[in-house]
Amino acid sequence: MEVTKGIILGEYDVIVEGEGESLDDRKSIPEILEDRGLDPKLVSSLITGPDASGTERSLLSWSEGQSDFSGEDRTLALLVHGPVDCDQLDYLLRDSHFTGVKHGVVDHNRLIECLRSQSGDIVVEQGGLSSLEGMLVARGLMYSAVYFHRVTRVTEVMLSRAVERAGDNLPDSLDLQRRVDAEIWAELDKVGGFSRDMVTRLKYRNLLKVCLSRRKEDMTQEQVERLAKAANNLAERRELEDDIAYRAGLEPGYVAIDVPSVKLLLSEPRMAQVDVKILGDDGKTRWLKEVTPMAEALRRRQVSQEAVYVMTTSGNERRVSEIAQKILFE
């Protein structure tokens, strides 16, 4: 988030040092904004929006941070971070296209036509209700089918562990932000060892296997709290992972514990916290839940069926599963 704001303000360059010489007439984002009469500071302030709470917008709670936003007219900020914002419409359509999963196809043109600003807030005209419902359903389905799919989780964990265990052998985090995927993979390959092995496995789709998973309702409160604590503490999580790996006769790193969302464990939030306002044909504004029963169904729908995954290399699933069961759940 701070990097994004820095780019808009001109405090952070997205080009690796020395590469700018190969680009002709390059303009920074603040220069482009100022050429069009826009204040970079105002634009950067919209990044955190009323629903972002000063960080990346919570994907599980639309209203988080709303009370911390000061200002009368929130229209622009809500278009960036809100119940119906440009980011959601963009990533649903884009990710649906590139993954081939059609759940994310929404009638974005109709929905945009029905967006209105009312008293500094964003509302949806009743004529766009079907399009809004379609977007909310699409969002929920995309999270289940793509973003929280177990294979997605496995690949993300493998890459994150490769970076995590590379330690100081990688360029600093700000420098990595300037790199494209291929460059980051090349850096991980140069590190060697575990990091090289993980990116090689990703390259040839020799992925880690999920050997144990649990739903929240299948765990005791003590188990839930322990997993949540470990997920929030890098050292504690790595200690658990490496303990299981050692007992299974594996090298450190070849057992991974993944908690897709700690919030799912602690408070069981739902994908659709129904804080969308509908402008009726009678001119009155109502909450979505007052207009359609679908809102309540969406609110109750869980993002991920599984609260925790334990992963390891192929051929070691049974042994790791038995050990992880004893350490984590007994």
Regions found by a protein language model. Name each.
Residues M1-R214:
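Sequence-structural signature of the catalytic-core scaffold of metal-dependent phosphohydrolases
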Residues V151, S160, L170-E330:
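Terminal helices and disordered tails flanking the catalytic cores of nucleotide-processing hydrolases
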